[in-house]
Amino acid sequence: MNTTFQQFAEAHSLRNGYKLAQTLSPVPPADDPQRLMAVWRSTNSHSVKGDIKHFIKSSTAHKRKLDHDETTGWVEVYTSYWKAVSEILAGESGKSSWTKVYEAWKELTSVLIRGYNSHGFEAWTIPSLYMVGKYLRLFAIKSDEERRAKAFDTGPGASLISDDFDPETDKQLQLRDCEGHLKRIFSLCLNDRAPLEESRKWGIYFVINLLFKTYFKLNSASLSRTILKTLAVYNDKGDMPPLEMFPKSQRVTFKFYEGVLLFLEENYIKAESHLNEAWQLCHKDAYPQSERILTYLIPCRLLTSHVLPTKALLENYPRLQDLFLPLATCIKTGNLQAFDQALQRGEAEFVKRRIYLTLERGRDIALRNLLRKVFIAGGFDEAKEADAAPVRRTRIPVAEFQAAISMGSGHLVDPDEVECMLANMIYKDLMKGYIARERGIVVLSKKGAFPGTGL
């Protein structure tokens, strides 16, 4: 454990919160894979608290000394950390469970929060909260997965488990419990009254992002609105550092989830703005993050400005190529049947990402492009004067649109259904004109018959 507390003392001497947080990691560093085992072997359950107090005092003796109250707080934290490490190592050897790991890590989280409330932990140490909060969520997910696996176990004792555990009701029990503890960290940061330069408010967006991830995992994305409303109150009072002053990685994640939340609320214009900001901030080599942003930004742009993704844009994203390029090709060519087939092929992934219904609206754009082709194929009206500029034919028989839609759909479409489709196009401002039913024609505008397409 000497290595851990040497790093602890150095972090305190430098006031380096991220270095301090590494001493609370449940994952050993790559250059010291036996770190957790060394921590566990350095003491035992009977003398752990006294040993840790000795380690902290001796390691900080020649550096920045801690006062008695703060020392007591960190002794409690590292005692809880040692117990959590014990469960992690026991789990690796099959002698513990993820549920016990989660409970031990939850205790560490509570003790660390108490350190800020009761033992005067300074704001520069907040990356420690990032570390425990991040892994609290991951251990909660692991625990829930373990419980579900046991619930469906058909081996001896399975019936005993199922008697008191409803897998549908309790399938995310630990993650819901975790959400409550993350909100405690959120409140701890939000309600700090210290001056901004030494405030825990600098940890707020990291914690908000953890809560966003938790709510989306719980399929309760709407709960994110409560967090955003609370944040807005503090921003309006000028009691919060500007978002631009936080690390770029935190801003990218925050803007992504804010954009997705607006996307799910069908506020596509605002969603596009937030997602585009996340896209612009995202590092060019952060492909997984960029891919997640594009998964929602592409459908947004399809609806707001009818812009289709290009092969060049998706060059580094094979999964997105498979999902979006077939749809983009069908929309561009107006091939309704192929569009329906491409949407059906990707249905499972589209539904999982909650973009199916949005992409389904892309069929209107495909239909618009098909109708536009009919308009172009109609050619020009005969010029009344020799030197007059050519004017496209604007009176199109409904029968011509019916033939095109039937061919594009792969089946005969009833004339009344065609008229309904045309009326819908006009209503959505994808086509300008009106239907003259008594004459069986569509009269299109001489200028801008298909807005945004150059015709």
From Swiss-Prot:
Coiled coil: none annotated. It comes from the Eukaryota. InterPro entries: Csn12-like, PCI_dom, WH-like_DNA-bd_sf. Signal peptide: none annotated. GO terms for molecular function: double-stranded DNA binding; RNA binding. Residues 252-449 form the PCI domain. Belongs to the CSN12 family. This is Protein CSN12 homolog.
